[in-house]
Amino acid sequence: MRVNREMTELWSAALGAAGTVIRYGHWGRPVLVFPSERGRAWDFENNGMVDAIGGLIDDGRLKLYCVDSFDAASWSNHDLPLEERARRHGRYESWIVGDVVPWIYRDCNGPAEVITVGCSMGAFHAANFALKRADLIPLAMCFSGNYDPSAWHAWGERGNQAYFNNPVDYVSHLEGDHLEWLRGQLSLLLVCGQGRWEDTTGALDSTRRFAALLAAKGIKHELDLWGHDVPHDWPSWRVQLAHHMPRFC
């Protein structure tokens, strides 16, 4: 790989542990990358995603900041009720907002408009963080996501933690000044194939439904559905990322 690469560990008091962040590039717009379910910071590189946009990185148009997930202890732990999974996700949110984003700002020599990117469960994270913190993240690029955690083997009573981490729920009830602000502040790109595993993961149906919800609320978004020969897998996401990223940096 030709691009500049630096790995660091950022301690999180909320998680009680350090998480890995890998930066790729030397200059450009910061792009915060969430891995797929239970993924690690190096998954993007290992699956060819960094190379797919390596020319943009080399040219100083963007810098990638790839982070660890916390899914194994939160969303992916199906032994826990959904409310507890969402509560545990809150620790991860504290790490991202309280530790990772400030580190990105320092690395960029000041505040900068961050893009979030994610594939599969990473797409959920990219959208959820952008919708909740559009002041920090005005653009989310989401590939093959399922945006409704209540569909993830959910059980148990649901309270505020589950509600405020389910974009389908809280976007449905957005109104007033905050909705008007989001309409002028935020944009989401929703990309999904129609091939193998996009239906069984729920990604295709969820992407369509989420796009319809955003349209009903007047929130800027773009829905890009690829063909029936485009599966829910890394080769698809490499091509889709390389296709879309040049427009935003």
Where are these regions (language model features)?
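Non-catalytic cap/lid and distal C-terminal segments of serine-dependent acyl enzymes
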Residues: 1-249
